[in-house]
Structures are given as structure tokens and as C-alpha cells.
Amino acid sequence: MSERGTTTAPAGLDAGADARHPALRVADRLRLTTVYVLLLTATACWLAGQSHGARARFVRHNSSNVHHMEVGKWWTMFTSGLVVDGVPAWAGIAAVAVVLGLAEWRWGPARAGAVFVFGHLGATLLTEGAMWVMLTARIPGALSRARDVGISYGLVGTAGCLLALGPAPLRRFGLPALGLGLAVTWALDQQLADAGHLVALGLGALAARTPWLRGRARARARVPVSATR
């Protein structure tokens, strides 16, 4: 049988398409996560080179607290998410790479980014709104200039959504276990951020009930393993 008229790809063309380092292929697929991790790393490296006073000023000026909301500095709700606080920078950045990366791998950048931002902004607005009510009612312990920066609200919200859309064992045991751990931490420390983590977890579980995410999760589950490689 003649093979004239058929087109054969040059040997090595397909191999060349996949010749990149595996890390580069992953970064290309997880562009949102890669960009965010690079931003967090750049901010952490810059802060590491500053004095203690300069770092404290940066955190203070980028905290999304009641005072900044009242004076119109709403942009702090976004810039606060560029600072890793409360844990070593490498640990926070690694957690973002894993959790946001897994979400982007499963749902795509639009859905993963939307869930992360929903958890971050939603928990920030609700906790600061509660703080504003406490200040208005003159309840002791309320602070208008509270230190509130970090990636944790978006991180917890995304993790909660992943657990809620995961296999049955994760939904039944993983999500309640995370909620219990966060509740115990809040009961022991009584910090604003601890309450925000519980709120973010609830928001993540709520986001998992939307058709936009549930439909994507079902479609992903129906795709054969060979088709996702």
C-alpha cells in the first residue's frame, strides 16, 4: 500500500513539545498559582531586607482593618493578601502553592481564583464588619486598627471548597476535622484572624454548592485518566 500523500510529523517533533522540564510544564498549566507565588516570594524577600520598624509599618499600612475601611483605603483588602504573616514565609508560600495549585489544576484558573478571592474578601468584610459593630456598640476588646494581613482567609476558603467537592471520605471527615481544628484554635486564642478562618471555611463550603463549581467537578470526574495527561 502506497504511503504517498500522507503527512508524517518529523521525528522528535512530539518529543520536542514535551522536552521542557516537568516543573516548567506544571508552571505553564498553573499560571495563576505561579504568578501569585512569585508575588508572595518577591514581597517576602523585600520585607526580609527591611528593618523591623519598616516591616511593622508596611504591615500596619496594608492591614485591612476598620480604620482603613473608614478612611477609604479599600485597596488594603487586596494588598493584605500579598503578605505572609503569622507563619514562616516559606511555609505560607508552600501552602499556597499546594492548595491554590490543586484548585487550579482541578477547576482552572478562573474558578480557583474566584474561590480564593471569595474566601479572602468575604471573610475580611464579615470579620471587619463584626468589629465595626462591636466598636459602634462600645463592646470591650474591639480594635479599629487591628493587624489583619495574610493569605490565610483565601487559603482556608479554597481548602474548604476542595474538601467539600472531594471524595466522600474527605467531605465526611476532612471538612469537619478542619472545622474542629479551627474552632479549637479560636476558642484558645480568641483572635480576630481565628474567627476569620472559620468564616472563610464556611464561605469555601458555600462556594462548593454553586453549580459553577459542582458542574466543573462532575465534568472533571467523568474525564478518563488518560485524557487528562
Regions flagged by a language model, labelled:
Residues 17-60:
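N-terminal signal-anchor transmembrane alpha helix
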Residues 47-109:
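N-terminal TM1-TM2 helical hairpin plus the immediately adjacent luminal interfacial "cap"
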Residues 1-26:
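Short, Lys/Arg-rich, polar N-terminal cytosolic tail immediately upstream
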Residues 40-46, 120-129, 177-192:
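Aromatic-anchored segments of alpha-helical transmembrane domains
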Residues 141-162, 196:
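Membrane-interface micro-motifs in multi-pass membrane enzymes
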Residues 111-139, 201, 205:
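Hydrophobic alpha-helical transmembrane segments of integral membrane proteins
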Residues 76, 94-101, 155-161, 176-186:
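Hydrophobic, membrane-inserted alpha-helices
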Residues 189-204:
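Loop-to-transmembrane alpha-helix initiation sites
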